[in-house]
Curated annotation (Swiss-Prot):
GO terms for cellular component: cytosol. This is Ribitol-5-phosphate cytidylyltransferase. CTP binds at residues 7-10, 80-86. The record marks 14, 22 as: Transition state stabilizer. InterPro entries: IspD/TarI (IPR034683), ISPD_synthase_CS (IPR018294), Nucleotide-diphossugar_trans (IPR029044), TarI (IPR034709). Belongs to the IspD/TarI cytidylyltransferase family. TarI subfamily. The lineage of its organism: Bacteria, Bacillati, Bacillota, Bacilli, Lactobacillales. It comes from Streptococcus agalactiae serotype Ia (strain ATCC 27591 / A909 / CDC SS700). Keywords: Cell wall biogenesis/degradation, Nucleotidyltransferase, Teichoic acid biosynthesis, Transferase. It catalyses: D-ribitol 5-phosphate + CTP + H(+) = CDP-L-ribitol + diphosphate. Catalyzes the transfer of the cytidylyl group of CTP to D-ribitol 5-phosphate.
Amino acid sequence: MNIGVIFAGGVGRRMNTKGKPKQFLEVHGKPIIVHTIDIFQNTEAIDAVVVVCVSDWLDYMNNLVERFNLTKVKAVVAGGETGQMSIFKGLEAAEQLATDDAVVLIHDGVRPLINEEVINANIQSVKETGSAVTSVRAKETVVLVNDSSKISEVVDRTRSFIAKAPQSFYLSDILSIERDAISKGITDAIDSSTLMGMYNRELTIVEGPYENIKITTPDDFYMFKALYDARENEQIYGM
């Protein structure tokens, strides 16, 4: 069984959206979160979707599920106090749906430019190696800095990747790590791959498209609109 856990728990302070969380902003009559879920909905390999939503917008999210006929969404749950705790709540909901050896794909609700090919590659990577971290090759040089803002290391660009999403694992594995981490007071890991790395788990890269952006700022929003229109018009992709 393959389950998408889609995190839509942010409130979008950097988007200046005057109260509406960024995941609910509309592009061509459809909220960003629905654009994202649609990809999972239309991917044959996905059996179910769990949406983790900011608590004050649960009813709104449930209405979107009904309005857009998102039949693979089997649960909409409230997020936690941190991103990690929100994902944990989504994983717990997935556990209620799962069969043995379920694969879970943890994805950002504001990454609507994912595609079926990457989703399928994530599932295959988990089955072969136990993990999948969707990533892109770094286009520019990455440097590490110290507390004095001095460069302490220049990272070899040929070995540098930027981690994105989905980040995918066997559900039982990530839940086991989450529960142990929480029991030790670790509740704010930046993402699931970071948490798994803290436990020295082997992580495998799945290369994804550069356009798999996370919509965080107004610039990101307008970039998504442009890329979406380009896809729709078939003027750029596939050339």
